[in-house]
Amino acid sequence: MGEVYAVGVGPGSARYITDVVKEVILYSDIIIGYKYTLKTIERLLVNKEVYEITMQNQEEIYQKVAKTLGDKTCAIPFTGDVNFSESEVVDRLIEIFGKVQIIPGISSVQVAAAKARVPLDKSKVITMHVTTSIEEKKLELQKALLDGYSVILVPRPWPKDPTKHFMQSEIAFYLKDHGFDTSKMKVHVFEFLTTDKETSFVGTVKDLECRQFSDLSVMVFDQTKPESYINFKTN
């Protein structure tokens, strides 16, 4: 079987695609990806065999390509970083194709943290963007906030099932229901990061109640306290 790559192509702007990922895509014969992801790399798709997938048909397409791959090279691009929020898909790709080479990309989490000026080394990163239960992740969010960490969080859009839908408004009510004073909690929400449609919101968690945001959004709970190296200088 030929080579198979899972690559991260950044949050949405072609400017955030790394050189190594560009090389892999240009080298590949077959590209399999979601519509939004393919749009990010559209200039690199000339003369490629391209398959646009959805959640409904992805298994069928992966199986089809696996059977006919031969000595060809296949790249499967993911929005952001392939190592974040995509483990369920990557695990399945490994089951289907065997060896899959993983090339990281720039995550919207990194961009959101930078824009909010919240350092990752003082933060907890949590993704609710999974199909499995998120109850433990909800507890993880509570603990991180109680422990004084900033939190960069990817919410879970699931509009067809309100019991699984856990976006900004649901998160705000959840935290309030669990004893947090959300009127005093600073939060950023970024949508469509790095693209022409990028928007940002800054306010309190309480402000998020009944407010709607895009599926392509990231939250940053800001509890950062500046600590420069000068504060730790010793004689």
Would you name each region that the model predicts?
Residues 64-68, 134-143, 173-175, 207-208:
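A short, acidic, amphipathic alpha-helical segment used as a generic capping/interface helix at domain edges
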Residues 33-36, 54-56, 79-81, 129, ...:
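Structural motif
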Residues 16-17, 85, 133-134, 162-163, ...:
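Secondary-structure boundary/capping motif
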Residues 2-6, 74, 145-235:
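A contiguous loop/helix-start segment that scaffolds small-molecule binding in enzyme catalytic cores
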Residues 13, 80, 84-149, 199-202, ...:
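Class I SAM-dependent methyltransferase SAM-binding "motif I" and its flanking Rossmann-like core
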Residues 40, 108, 128, 159, ...:
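Positions that flank functional sites
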Residues 1-103, 110-111, 207-209, 217-218:
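Class I S-adenosyl-L-methionine
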